Amino acid sequence: MEQGPRCEWVLLEEDKIVKLGNGDGYRQYETEGIRQIDAAGATVLPGFIDNHFHLINSALMESWVNLEGADTFTEMGERLRCACAEGRKVVLAYNLSVEELKEKRFPSRIELDRICDDRPVFLLSRDVHTIVLNTFAILYYKMPFAANGVGLDDRKMPTGIFRGQAAALLETKVNEIFTPEDFDEATQAFLPALFCEGITTIAAMEGSNHLTGHGHDSECDFLVKNAARYPLSIELFYQTTDVRLVADEGLRRIGGALYIDGTFGTHSASLTTDYADMPGVRGYNFFTDGYMRSFVEECCENGLQIGFDAIGDAAIDSVLDALEYAARKRNVRPMRHRIEHAELIRIDQMEKAARLGVVLCMQPGYEARWGFPGGMYEERLGARYGETNRFREILDHGITICGGSDHSVCEISPMVAISSAVNHPVPENSITRQEALEMYTINGAYALFLEEERGSIAEGKAADLIILDRNLDEVSDSDLAEVKVDLTIKNGEIIYERTDAC
């Protein structure tokens, strides 16, 4: 999309950019009370926009047990036992990565019972699509064994592994223990983690009732009432299929992480071919094609932008089919419907997406985590390895890509993600650093209908700016991930200045 003019100085007044220039023209504005900030030759950029962020969950998880780096059941068990010894009434843990575990599988409830059997233990996988409970937790949360996604053994007893509808139900039950005051306290404490990475706007993917039925969600209701209180622009995607609820709230967006399929890690992302390491398995879609068509039709009638969480190419087929069906009655291009992730999009699907005006919200960090030779993508996809996250071909088809971290799946830093897009493990899928930067600036604004307000440094736009710690023109591609943010400005106010702590 657009690349703004290069300039040497920017004048801010209140919450807007009012003047750009080169040379010493800024001197005419040097008056008492004007603060000057010298970037000292470092690069100044628009504030970063993260288009796929789970704000409330990320904030709450700061107090959970982090299983990052636990590569054996033994290491996992040690961390959980420490949490039990601290006297936690409920042990909540996240970032359990089955791909990194030596055992290459999730623990069972019986194995968790051996670690802790006198209180609920709740483990969330790194891809946030699988939950593992001990026996105490299964009883504590009163999980119905008949729910879709409950893992059962040969005796029809629960294994402790929950996916799909069952996992969504569990998320709802866990969040019931948190009050609005808990949400606020966690959010206030967490926001500096975004500011120090230069993020000034997020698309907040909130709620977990899209697989469990209609009705209000406590996370979403909290943000509807309180988002404007924070020094961060929060654009809410209400993760539900209840169109009437979202329309009545006066919101413009629905879905986000609206699961159309599962993930590669759990062999549940919906494919048109078998998994390389599990012949005969192709994953599955959560919704029928008929339901998808009627849902999209209702959203279009109510003017709602939709975010579809679709990873495998069969799931992407379902989304594009529903959009093509809606396009028979109306022009869907101006609605900028989105596919989140779209990791295995085919060439013919790129052509359809471009024709329908679909925006792809993608996560370059996935390639750094799973895309390397011998990594999870290659294990699951075999011959199709190399077809994931094809940023170059997608852009060449005229599709807008915006970027998101999907935190806590990937780390927050947009610069790390930008590095991943530029240094894709499959070189032909890489893009230029300018294209990668646009994923988190002007393209990010476009994906949220905010391109007239932010996303570039231009007169009249929001005074959302960041100063990096160096000149990007002097940074090699291999060093992009090392670039830090020195200063973050939101609506003309400094909200972050770097210290050694960040």
Feature locations, PLM:
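Divalent metal-binding segments
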Residues: 2-230, 236-244, 265-298, 302-311, ...
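Phosphate/diphosphate-binding loops
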Residues: 223-254, 336-343, 347, 378-399
